[in-house]
Amino acid sequence: MLQRLVVALCLLGFAALTAAAAHQRPNFVVIFTDDQDGIQNSTHPRYQPKLHEHIRYPGIELKNYFVTTPVCCPSRTNLWRGQFSHNTNFTDVLGPHGGYAKWKSLGIDKSYLPVWLQNLGYNTYYVGKFLVDYSVSNYQNVPAGWTDIDALVTPYTFDYNNPGFSRNGATPNIYPGFYSTDVIADKAVAQIKTAVAAGKPFYAQISPIAPHTSTQIYFDPVANATKTFFYPPIPAPRHWELFSDATLPEGTSHKNLYEADVSDKPAWIRALPLAQQNNRTYLEEVYRLRLRSLASVDELIDRVVATLQEAGVLDNTYLIYSADNGYHVGTHRFGAGKVTAYDEDLRVPFLIRGPGIRASHSDKPANSKVGLHVDFAPTILTLAGAGDQVGDKALDGTPLGLYANDDGNLLADYPRPANHRNQFQGEFWGGWSDEVLHHIPRYTNNSWKAVRVYDEDNQQAWKLIVSCTNERELYDLKTDPGELCNIYNKTRAAVRTRLEALLAVLVVCKGESCTNPWKILHPEGSVNSWNQSLDRKYDKYYANVAPFQYRTCLPYQDHNNEVSAFRSTVAAAAAAAAAAAAQQPGRRRMYTWTSAGRQLSATASAIATSPQPRSEPFVAEVERHSVPVPAEVLQSDVAKWFDNPLALA
């Protein structure tokens, strides 16, 4: 009798644990690199085999995923806040129009993804690069929203072999002779173990610096000056001889290396010299160094997946891989860098695996839905079971098109729009400088806007770029993916006028108008897509829409300088939408997964916490080798270090 009772109790206990696990919300692990392109083959399985083994093959790649402000700090803010830079007004790497002080003064960390997730019962973790000028001078002013944040601090952020971190605002430590990505991997594994032991769902973001350029900053007592030096990325010692036969991919469909004829480009690009053979040889080595620096990131992926697997949480975890912005090497007339409106700088990798996502099992099938960094936060919230809250946060993004790869177990209320976004805008304020060919002078007037239209069936793909000088470029991306032939004055008026109208709306969009600009252009509802807009009966209307114009070139956002006929219309629509949302009854249900995964039940019950919470965090082995940052560095004037902010981005 006693034996039967014990068996019965065991079965009941197992059933309870199974039910609790079935209702536990998913975890998220995001591996977020720095300056990794989505075009020049940096994620090829030859160079990142573990990325494919652990994320691409068990998941999917979004092949049309873009950033909209191609420089690190504004782009990271787009990711966490779900808003375009013209709505965050965080537009630069450093102050006064960017930088950590402005980021805090804008209150961005009062309402962004980690805070929202904590409000849902998640623990949140961060390790690696946060923002460029999070430094030895301001580390105590910790960004809100993180259960545990172990962030790189300047001047050690881009020092591959001497990284420095501050954990939760503590005095920074450095790790002399230890490779930055390896230190981040050790710390990330410890954070994940801590997160699992806490027994709550978690979001962990891991942000290595590769393949960003290396930066050395030090004070020269003889010259009584701070000196900053920029170099190509530095691989881990064990990876220096990898990929010695790799070359810049001239065989891609873009074919825009060392563009000879730039007569149709803006004046500042026409003034750039064509790279000579010695420069090209150097750029080839820069390309190889970027690939080699990513080899340690690939090893990091392997360690993270092994940790999740050993902890038994891999199957309930979304594992995501992406980057803060794209990067070009040798394209057009450029050496190496970012911040242009061309696709090399805008397109980034985005790979994801997790509950409900059908495995691709190869590199060939891919998701063709357009995705942007502003879509990231609403996607995470929706997958976390809080899709009903997305509309409350004034976001410009919408959940990614993961429904196209539903294996039958994706959330039942995951949005499945009839018309997924097929147009978006890009924007940048500031200058341009070449990050490796330092003999090329810096150009200060590189502010620009762009609009890109993409037909999922690949029948049409267009891009319009407007420089702050009001010079215009238009490319047919279906026939010219390398953006070599500017056809602004050659294409038919119907295409040109529709693109101009879309740009005029999207550069000032807020909320719904960012995903559906047609509602602003055609409030009566007669047009809901690019193809519908091309009907000849609308030719006269579009011919009379005033194109977007700059009054002058400025390195920052000024609404009076950026002239759009739709600014007041968009603002009124956004205000009306906010007022309507405020009148809606509050929906604050906490959604949980059922064992089938397809259905959701509304409940206020606590998150399953099968393991007993662990009070002390796991400590990474590498911590034994850390030493305090020298006192003279802690007392130095950080502002003097930033003499080339674009190279630091």
UniProtKB/Swiss-Prot annotation:
Keywords (A to Z) from UniProt: Calcium, Glycoprotein, Hydrolase, Metal-binding, Periplasm, Signal, Stress response
Induction line: By sulfur deprivation.
Temperature note: Optimum temperature is 60 degrees Celsius. Thermostable.
Binding positions for Ca(2+) per the UniProt entry: D34, D35, C72, D324, N325
Reaction it catalyzes: an aryl sulfate + H2O = a phenol + sulfate + H(+)
Active site feature: C72
Ways its activity is controlled: Inhibited by Na(3)BO(3) and KCN. No inhibition by sodium dodecyl sulfate, even at high concentration.
One Gene Ontology term of the molecular function aspect: N-acetylglucosamine-6-sulfatase activity
Segment forming the signal sequence: 1-22
Cofactor comment: Binds 1 Ca(2+) ion per subunit.
Principal location listed in the UniProt entry: periplasm
Glycosylated position list: N41, N89, N224, N279, N445, N489, N531
Entry's family note: Belongs to the sulfatase family.
Protein's name in the database: Arylsulfatase
